[in-house]
Amino acid sequence: MIAAPEIPTDFNLLQESETHFSSDTDFEDIEGKNQKQGKGKTCKKGKKGPAEKGKGGNGGGKPPSGPNRMNGHHQQNGVENMMLFEVVKMGKSAMQSVVDDWIESYKHDRDIALLDLINFFIQCSGCKGVVTAEMFRHMQNSEIIRKMTEEFDEDSGDYPLTMAGPQWKKFKSSFCEFIGVLVRQCQYSIIYDEYMMDTVISLLTGLSDSQVRAFRHTSTLAAMKLMTALVNVALNLSINMDNTQRQYEAERNKMIGKRANERLELLLQKRKELQENQDEIENMMNAIFKGVFVHRYRDAIAEIRAICIEEIGIWMKMYSDAFLNDSYLKYVGWTMHDKQGEVRLKCLTALQGLYYNKELNSKLELFTSRFKDRIVSMTLDKEYDVAVQAIKLLTLVLQSSEEVLTAEDCENVYHLVYSAHRPVAVAAGEFLYKKLFSRRDPEEDGMMKRRGRQGPNANLVKTLVFFFLESELHEHAAYLVDSMWDCATELLKDWECMNSLLLEEPLSGEEALTDRQESALIEIMLCTIRQAAECHPPVGRGTGKRVLTAKEKKTQLDDRTKITELFAVALPQLLAKYSVDAEKVTNLLQLPQYFDLEIYTTGRLEKHLDALLRQIRNIVEKHTDTDVLEACSKTYHALCNEEFTIFNRVDISRSQLIDELADKFNRLLEDFLQEGEEPDEDDAYQVLSTLKRITAFHNAHDLSKWDLFACNYKLLKTGIENGDMPEQIVIHALQCTHYVILWQLAKITESSSTKEDLLRLKKQMRVFCQICQHYLTNVNTTVKEQAFTILCDILMIFSHQIMSGGRDMLEPLVYTPDSSLQSELLSFILDHVFIEQDDDNNSADGQQEDEASKIEALHKRRNLLAAFCKLIVYTVVEMNTAADIFKQYMKYYNDYGDIIKETMSKTRQIDKIQCAKTLILSLQQLFNEMIQENGYNFDRSSSTFSGIKELARRFALTFGLDQLKTREAIAMLHKDGIEFAFKEPNPQGESHPPLNLAFLDILSEFSSKLLRQDKRTVYVYLEKFMTFQMSLRREDVWLPLMSYRNSLLAGGDDDTMSVISGISSRGSTVRSKKSKPSTGKRKVVEGMQLSLTEESSSSDSMWLSREQTLHTPVMMQTPQLTSTIMREPKRLRPEDSFMSVYPMQTEHHQTPLDYNRRGTSLMEDDEEPIVEDVMMSSEGRIEDLNEGMDFDTMDIDLPPSKNRRERTELKPDFFDPASIMDESVLGVSMF
């Protein structure tokens, strides 16, 4: 047992215990450590008689007898036979009654009452020991704490403050409440008796220095709460002294005849008593601050550090005259560099309480100037909670004084409105709003009642637009709006103002919006309307849609009504004004999907609906841009809702538009495809533009009645025959035909269909697949990519999955690609996805655009690869085609590593053995490619061969730790690998190694994944291919065989998992080595092996002969899983595990103490935490801030009364940079 550190020898606060937990030499005068101690280092000893041996009380200290006393607690309020700990633990009794009972006990016999209180703190620490009256009288603090340490339960690291469960849920709050109430009830007498507080403070100081975390944590919390209660007492004393001083001054200023001398004497006496009491409180607070806080605020346990910082924040806020100065603020400033987020969070919340009170700002100026940069950098903290509070703190700093934060500081916060983490973004949005939008000029007061362009929000909307454009993140308007939604709702919902800024002419002297600003305003307006209508954050921010409250639903309905009433009238005007601007029109056309369409009828707005439909028709005729046309299509889809009466009106308009487009397309196509005539560019443009419009509408609308398959088929077939069809026409014809197929399938699936419908769709689908296959060999890359993407979609949709969900009637539509099509798809991937990035065009002018194009190209290639991998995962194509994909894993890891890895995982879930065979096939392909390039006499140390080995190692890692689950797959992998290695005999004879023998070097990377018995089985199988001469060879060329054999013969020591690992997550629990396994246990192991009940008819294909006792089923042609462990894993006892038969050698390593998690050990080394900067991005990283700090050990001195000018013992200002931190440590000036 590690002894507790030495504690002061009695209940005297004179000495500061020298901690074994942290070297707090920063706070001590090393050279004059034992010299005379100044004021504040002591609390006076209680006055005791000669017969009282240092403990005071009723002489012998015997507990009183009587019915009203039990365990030092009165039997009142229904609480009987309970100690203080039990009462606080229950948390049901009124705490004041509990404390009053203890005070009565203390007045009767203070030693016995204090003994109860001491045992209360011991029990609250989770210690089962009890301090007896004899120990209390005769033993010193250090001896008592050492004795209690020995009574601790070492098997568990839990104690009341950390225990889980409902009974402990409120323990901490009850514990803290008890201490606060105790001091409050004792504040007028008992705390000044120079005994009770001396005893408690000395005990808590000693416990807080213990190496037992439970003692340290509990006593630190108690001491800090005790200090907080004393600060409150000191504050009350200060108020009383001020009142007494005012009364005294008023009485003394009276005329001599009216002056009451007796009252003056009483007031002087009262002031003197209050002064003495204040001095006593100062001594107590000094003792706690120096004995506990200055040591524990740097404790190794984050919870303890957090307690200290939280409480010092309360002291500074509660009694700012005494504590809000740089001598105490420095502790918070230093701790902002703490390595644990919860401690940094406490620092920020403590500072928020101070900055919130504007009256305290003058006292924070020096602190702000020193630590402002740190606070700004914490907005990028890796802990999001810390970042949020840092931004909120800066918002308070901004409100207190705008001059403190520079433009650069503000910009560091501004960009966080685009953060994907919503709480961070919302906090940054509030900061932005306070900085740029909350101020209003006096001249704007007269504009409050105005609306629209002349309203008070007009300038603010412009400011928002300017900010959005300057941020240069034009694709993230939704994020900006969401960030400011909570704090600037009124501004963001002023759609009337936004609309007037777009439609109305600027006033005289007002600068009009530029084209770029109008585009930005329209985008922001769209995002605000979407946010109001949908009531959830944009994609990528938040956890998805939540259930709206009744109030939120009402607000949503009101907003949609307001949006519809305004924009049903304004939208046609906006479309007319910006009809030629594709970007603006695209955004404006999205508004109707957020309308309440019923208002068109109830509000008699049909004429505005007609105007909207006319504008959409005009836009379709004017534009050929795909985004604009799709926006028009979606708008028609939103308006064509059969639930509303406007459906007929919109449907007629849509049908008329499609009729005209279809007729025009057929007419143009007939002219375009006339034989013998060369189509000119104008004809091609007309065909393309019309086809674009039809394709865009076919995306959202069923146009089956216009029979678009025939004309598109004719167009595509002509393109194949002639080979001169413009690429854009082919691309859109393929896409349009794809939509035709999908709409027909949807119609067949949703309603009963005839056999003729199925056969017609089957024929069209097969013909279309053949056309797409033809276009895979087109000379144009864009056409090939479109054909490949559509072909993958068609194969996926019409695979065997189409019959799932009870749709067996669709079986005739199932289409399985033949080997030639699979081969062409794979060739396309190899030729167009696994290619090197073109780095030629890197001019300075076009570098940024070039980077953007590269990213876009990579994104396109990733989509192509994902489409093909989906075919592999859903077994639409053969799994072995994945070998050509898997072998690219290392080479293209940065670009496609995640896709390939996920494909491996999914294929392994489908078929472990086939996946393993595919992996080994990919390695064999790479090996063969290396042989073709370098010949059989290649260098095994070459980068190419090393790369293949590294790929094998990566493949091995993907099998995970559960060897039992992958047992068969790994065995089959070794089988295929061995056969490949010996497949090509050396033409020079058996004295030379087989041509592929070096492949065994690659195969050895998988040996660690074999179970012990399977290693023996694989070794036996390997020997079937070896001759006697091979086993004797030791030349370098035979090294792969030797290393592979050794990896199989390594046996148990190389095994990292036992068979039982697949059954129990507990793993091996062997604590001691066993000499020899019992026979019974050996039988269990043999029973765990996968046995064979059938033999292969061909002996050549068998791994083992019948005489061999170890069997690995995957090495047979017909594997059968007959093992008990595979069927009923729970029947195995832990003592019968594989590990108990083959005990692993245990290596003892010295494990460093991990402060990031609470362990279960009783004793701890009290290392000082490394204070580190944990920012994502920070400058001027401070290394080990605590090291070399020269802490001052100032006394707590309460400020003099504002009217007590005669007091001369005023303390100097302790804020001395030299006493705070040695500047040589940081290399920068502290302030």
From Swiss-Prot:
It comes from the Eukaryota. Residues 1-75, 1064-1083 are annotated as: Disordered. Residues 36-48, 1071-1082 have a biased composition (Basic residues). Keywords: Acetylation, Cell cycle, Cell division, Centromere, Chromosome, Chromosome partition, Disease variant, Holoprosencephaly, Meiosis, Mitosis, Nucleus, Phosphoprotein. Its main location: nucleus. The modification Phosphoserine is found at S1058, S1061, S1064, S1065, S1177, S1178. It is linked to Mullegama-Klein-Martinez syndrome: An X-linked neurodevelopmental disorder with variable features including intellectual deficiency, microcephaly, microtia, hearing loss, developmental delay, dysmorphic features, language delay, congenital heart defect, and clinodactyly of the 5th finger. Holoprosencephaly 13, X-linked: An X-linked form of holoprosencephaly, a structural anomaly of the brain in which the developing forebrain fails to correctly separate into right and left hemispheres. Holoprosencephaly is genetically heterogeneous and associated with several distinct facies and phenotypic variability. HPE13 features range from full alobar holoprosencephaly with cyclopia to semilobar holoprosencephaly or septooptic dysplasia. Dysmorphic features include microcephaly, hypotelorism, low-set ears, micrognathia, and cleft lip/palate. This is Cohesin subunit SA-2. It comes from Homo sapiens (Human).
